[in-house]
Structure formats: structure tokens, C-alpha cells
Amino acid sequence: MKVITGGVTAAKGFEAAGVEAAIKYKNRKDMAIIYSKKPCVMAGTFTNNVVKAAPVLWDKKVVEESPYGQAVIVNAGIANACTGKEGYEYCRKTALRASEALGIPEESVLAASTGVIGMQLPIDRIEAGIEKLVKAKTDTIEAGTQAAEAIMTTDTHSKQAAVEIEIGGVKVTLGGMSKGSGMIHPNMCTMLAFLTTDAVISKEALTKIVKEDVEDTFNMISVDGDTSTNDTLLVMANGMAGNEEIKEGTPEFEAFKEAVHYINETLAKMMAGDGEGATALIEAKVIGAATKEEAKILSKSVVCSSLTKAAVYGHDANFGRMICALGYSGVSFDPDKIELFFESKAGRIQVFKDGVSTNYDEEEASRILAQPEVTILADMKMGTKEATAWGCDLTYDYVKINADYRS
């Protein structure tokens, strides 16, 4: 696997664009398009929130019922959630306008939105934005970057990744982009993620890979514990690489799965580290758990702990907060067997063993926690299973950003 520059336009046959449409923001790009020159096999996962935004309902229908997809229209600023029948009708109008402009079936167009909940979309601006997107779309790396920038809300930077692999001697490319900064606690922010590939793969095989991998990547991040109404991951495969079809149970399937995992994990970590107001990416790694599921529960409990997040922000080696988070996770374990470590580029230090503090050096621990990427490692001494979750520190700016989000 080779990591390359780019995002959703890295794979053969994909075009993108980002334009200003004045949906809610002024003087910035706020609409994006991803378009494939050929119809795509589609797979997707969506929010588990009972309250689902209109575009989530639309996209679920397209992914499940349409034979293929070919374009995605994304807007930032307004979520089109809690908008009733009118909001869903605006999804249909978005798809209709895009289908007319692109010359493709309405049922092959997907829609995604992110932003303020409860506001109706200005459909006239959406339709005008679609016209601009269709004219602007190209297959350049820059076009992919513009699309990634256009879908941002409180994100501080765009998020992209791309790789190349070989399938039966044929080069296959995968690329992706995502957005998410606040309201990220997906169980599939708002978390939006889009992957494109030129691989030849069946819908069944692609769906299996996506649904399994999301459990170890996007569903293992948390910024603020809120699961959005709009969380969406869409994957498009247009087959233009011309490889022999990837089938389950083959080495090619595993190679493709590894590439999808790399893209998903890279984008997930970018989102976790770009939490609203964040200064550090927190990685909570649990090893020695009895089961994989328990390892996941334990690691997510740590990254979801507000007290843990605040401690990392303050570079305070208050290990009790992490032990406490493990303790209320719902997983049974022997506290006297746990070993807890802090790790970063500044070093590694053990802070807890045999049920008590290790009398560690506070200054050394603080230096380790002062790095932009920090790992909290917990060895449960119960088995061989492990899991990793990602989050960010909790700062004063998080409250400031969300106190006036609608203004």
C-alpha cells in the first residue's frame, strides 16, 4: 500500500468541486460535489440517533434501493434535520436538479448536510449552487481539496487521505474526505465522510468491508459525546481501474479491506484531533482485555471522560480520572491488576500498578501530556484482546465555540 497525495479525486474517473452558495456562511465555500464519470456501486453507514436528518433518510433509501449512485451534493451551514416533510422534499429537489444538470437518474444522486439543526434549506440557493458545482467540477487534486474545504463547519482544517494498492497486478486507488469537529460520537460532528475508489468490487463485498471497518474507526472516536442526527459515511466504487472483481475470502479482499481501514482510521483520527477548541489528540489504547467488545467499551469510556479530557488539556497526570472512567464503563475487572501508562513523543511513564500510584515524576508526566498527541495505555491483565479509541482534550474554547454556534 502506497500513501499518495489527494482525496476524493485521487481515484480514476472522479471529479469534485467546492463553491460559495451562501447557504448560511458568507465569503467561504459551503457546497461540494463528488461526481463519477461512471455509475458506482454504493455502500454506506448512518447515524444511530433515532432523530435522523432528511438527507440521512434520503441516502439510506438510495443506497438500499438504487442499483447504483453517481453523485453526492453536500452543503455546510444548515443540517436539514428536524425539518419534516419539507426537508425531505428539499432532498428530492436537490437530487432532481443535480440529475438534470449532470444528465443522470435522480435516484443516483445522494445528498448530505451539516450545520444548524431546525432550519430549512434555502432551496433556491442550493439549486443555484448545484449549477455552479457542475460547471466547476474537475478531476484535479485541487478540486478535491476545495470540496473538502467546502464541507467544513467548525473544523479548523480540511481532512483528506488517499492510497494506492495493487489488485492482481492492476493499480487500484482509494481516496477520501471527511468533516467533523463538534458533535462527534458516531455509532455507525456531525461526522460526514466520503470515500471513492476505482476498484471493481461487488456491492455485497463493499458493504461488508465498510460496515465491519467503521466499528474500529469512525465508531471509536469521540469529541463531546454527542451523536449527530446527520452522521454519514458513503463509499463509491466505479470500477474504472479494471481489476478482476474483488471477492470475499481472497487475498485481494484483505488488501482492499486494509486500504479502506487506513483511509477510515486516518480520517477518524484527523476528526478526533480537530475537536472544537482542541489542542491535543488523545489515543486511549486498552490491551489485555477479556474480549474485543470489552476492550472497545473500556477505551471509549476513557476518551469520553470530560475529566480525562480536561486533565490532558492541563497536562495534569491525574491518573485517577482514567481509572475512574474504566471503572464506570460497565466492564468487570480487578483494579489491582491494571497497569496504566502515559505515552507521547516526549517519552513513556507508568503511573499506576498493583492498585496504587507508582510514585512517578510529576514533571516528567506533565511533559509527556503536553504533546499534541498523547496515548493513555491501560493493560487490563485479563486476556489478549485490545482496542483503540480516539478523542481530544477539553478546553475553554469548546464552550466559547458552542455557546454562540448559531450566531
At which residue positions do the language-model features occur?
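A structural signal for small-residue-enriched, beta-sheet-centric alpha/beta enzyme cores
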Residues: 1-75, 79-89, 99-407
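Generic structural marker for isolated residues within well-ordered, non-membrane alpha-helices
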Residues: 95
